[in-house]
Amino acid sequence: MKLIVTVVGKDRVGIIAAVTNILADNNVNILSINQNILDGFFNMILFAEASESKIRLVDLQQKLREQGEAIGVEIKTQHQDIFDVMHKI
């Protein structure tokens, strides 16, 4: 299962580490990361492969959402198929 993780919020040290540690702990492989900072706001989109992971998508979404709340950013996780349909022109 391929996933898209988006992160948005005020920039601070450790955002990427906070997100990627959860993914690594749950055997989710990162395929690509794009991030930037604009006017002090952090934006990241991460593409990942979760076929080797045992965690259910809903549980991973909750862990990442809770981590986002703890560090002051919004983290959304979607199956890539859903993301693709929502962003198709």
Task: State where each predicted segment sits.
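A conserved regulatory-domain signal marking ACT and ACT-like small-molecule sensing domains
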Residues: M1-I89
